[in-house]
Amino acid sequence: MQLEQKSSLHCSKCRNFLQKFSQDMQAWNCRELDSPLPSDITLHNLEPARPDSGMSFSTDFDDDFFNLDLHQQERSASFGGVTQYSQQFLREKCSFSPYFHTSLETVDSGRTSLYGSNEQCGQLGGASSNGSTAMLHTPDGSNSHQTSFPSDFRMSESPDDTVSGKKTTTRRNAWGNMSYAELITTAIMASPEKRLTLAQVYEWMVQNVPYFRDKGDSNSSAGWKNSIRHNLSLHSRFMRIQNEGAGKSSWWVINPDAKPGRNPRRTRERSNTIETTTKAQLEKSRRGAKKRIKERALMGSLHSTLNGNSIAGSIQTISHDLYDDDSMQGAFDNVPSSFRPRTQSNLSIPGSSSRVSPAIGSDIYDDLEFPSWVGESVPAIPSDIVDRTDQMRIDATTHIGGVQIKQESKPIKTEPIAPPPSYHELNSVRGSCAQNPLLRNPIVPSTNFKPMPLPGAYGNYQNGGITPINWLSTSNSSPLPGIQSCGIVAAQHTVASSSALPIDLENLTLPDQPLMDTMDVDALIRHELSQAGGQHIHFDL
């Protein structure tokens, strides 16, 4: 609709222009006919008519519509292509044509919206073209002289980079151009002692880097603190030194042997090397040995309470045999003092109360079932008694009531007895014989004599007298009652100690042994069968 209106308007303007042009031509032709032109003047020599040369035009605003130069300048100004000639022509038009000045203001208003100010529109030559080019690169078009840089270009802060103008590939972090490692290095070098703890590195970050100032709380600081710990641990630039105080954090310093520049990550120690594997195994063995020693010490304390500290010596011996290497000596430095050295253990003392004995032929009895009383502690025979068996004598003199009585051996009808075994054979079977309850006490040989009745002590004296036969029978044994009682005691000593001991060993009292109090007959029979080895067993009833 607007296009049709413009077309009709143009048509009316054209008709008016043609009418006025025809009238002007007629008037000009009439004037020229009145004053003919000189013969030396041609149409090529004539200068173009100017509005200020005295020629008057009766034009209005509609005449500017057909000015082609004006339309060309307006079209060029709309696209920013103002040339030096067109700019000069516009200034000349502004000086003498009030109608064209209105149209120029319209063009300037359009350029103002494009470039931002009238001052920028007045620039000539290449400045305007540069401004239009800058507008295409600048999103907001606010500054026509600002040069747009690529997004990955880093604005260098050092003067060397500014002069050289070279492009770097360092990634720009949120806090600046420095990496975590560079920030940590700066923090350590800024400290007076050139060393910082991990907490001090955190504090320096919060105080000196603006990006971390509002991220110092526990919720928002977990990420960057974790990155700092990783950089300290993985980069060879940093080195950890143990703090002198107990329970304090380690110091972090700059490694003087590190290479300058971007340092590679620290290579972790491989745990599968021979040296590290050997050390790890030795340390593990030491810990295991200590643990086993403590457990055995606890068990030994329990057994010692029940059996008279009988297992403590064997624990020390076993622990010494398990780790006999010199490298394992450090594992036993902290062993409790209750463990005695091996030379003082119960195994080396024959007369101790321990049931632990040399394992001579002990494998024979591993599969046998022994009665419950066999496991009880059995006091061993003192070594000095065994060693002094050669001092035993037949003719022994006993002291009874301060009276020295010489014991004479009397012939007793007994069966022939085999000679006793040697000391080494006796010692080899002593462990098995000591466990047999029938062999614990000396066997008293059976005799044919009967104890003689005392005169006046029984029924013969009650009848009022003593018959000659009874008196004779009694008098043959002992003429006096006092002497008879002494003889009975002497006979008992003779039977009990058929082979008398030395005088300093006669009064030795051995511990009482439980004989038949809690005896299991079935277990005893099985034990005797296992000891006999298929031979006949005889029990003396």
From Swiss-Prot:
Keyword Nucleus: yes
DNA-binding region(s), residue ranges: 175-268
CDD domains assigned to the protein according to its UniProt record, in alphabetical order: FH_FOXO
Modification Phosphothreonine occurs at: 273
Phosphoserine: residues carrying this PTM: 319
Gene3D superfamilies found in the cross-reference section: Winged helix-like DNA-binding domain superfamily/Winged helix DNA-binding domain (1.10.10.10)
Subcellular location as annotated: Nucleus; Cytoplasm
Regulation: induction: Induced by quinic acid.
InterPro entries named in the record: Fork_head_dom, TF_fork_head_CS_2, WH-like_DNA-bd_sf, WH_DNA-bd_sf
GO molecular function annotations of the record: 14-3-3 protein binding; beta-catenin binding; DEAD/H-box RNA helicase binding; DNA-binding transcription activator activity, RNA polymerase II-specific; DNA-binding transcription factor activity; DNA-binding transcription factor activity, RNA polymerase II-specific; DNA-binding transcription factor binding; enzyme binding
Cellular component aspect of the GO annotation: cytoplasm; cytosol; nucleus
BP GO terms, sorted: cellular response to heat; cellular response to oxidative stress; dauer larval development; defense response to Gram-negative bacterium; defense response to Gram-positive bacterium; determination of adult lifespan; DNA damage response; heat acclimation
Pfam families to which the protein is assigned, alphabetical: Forkhead
Tissue: Isoform b and isoform c are expressed in ectoderm, muscles, intestine and neurons. Isoform b is also expressed in the pharynx. The intestine appears to be the primary site of longevity function.
The entry's keywords: Cytoplasm, Developmental protein, DNA-binding, Growth regulation, Immunity, Innate immunity, Nucleus, Phosphoprotein, Repressor, Stress response, Transcription, Transcription regulation, Ubl conjugation
Biased composition (Polar residues): 118-150
Domain of life, source organism: Eukaryota
Post-translational modification: Phosphorylated by akt-1 and/or akt-2. Phosphorylated by sgk-1. Phosphorylated by unc-43. Phosphorylated by jnk-1. Dephosphorylated by tax-6 in vitro.
Gene disruption: observed consequences: Dauer defective phenotype in larvae and a reduced stress phenotype in adults. Increased carbonyl accumulation and increased sensitivity to starvation. Increased expression of the srh-234 chemoreceptor during starvation. Increased sensitivity to physical injury and more susceptible to death by nematophagous fungal infection. Reduces life span and motor activity throughout life. Suppresses the life-span extension and higher motor activity in aged slo-1 background mutant. Causes a delay in apoptosis during embryonic development. Defective gustatory associative learning in response to salt cues.
Known outcome of mutating residue 268 to K: Decreases methylation by prmt-1. Prevents phosphorylation by akt 1 and/or 2
Primary location: nucleus
Chain residue ranges for the region called Disordered: 118-168, 252-291
Subunit and interaction comment: Interacts with rle-1. Interacts with unc-43 and tax-6. Interacts with jnk-1. Interacts with ftt-2. Interacts with prmt-1. Interacts with hcf-1.
Biological function: Forkhead-type transcription factor. Binds to the promoters of genes that contain the daf-16/FOXO binding element (DBE), TTGTTTAC, in their regulatory region. Functions in the Insulin/IGF-1-like signaling (IIS) mediated pathway which affects lipogenesis, lifespan, starvation survival, heat shock and oxidative stress responses, sleep, associative memory, and dauer formation. Longevity signaling predominantly arises from expression in the intestine. Acts in the intestine to mediate the role of slo-1 in age-associated decline in motor activity and longevity.
Protein name (database record): Forkhead box protein O
High-level lineage: Eukaryota, Metazoa, Ecdysozoa, Nematoda, Chromadorea
Gene that this polypeptide is encoded by: daf-16
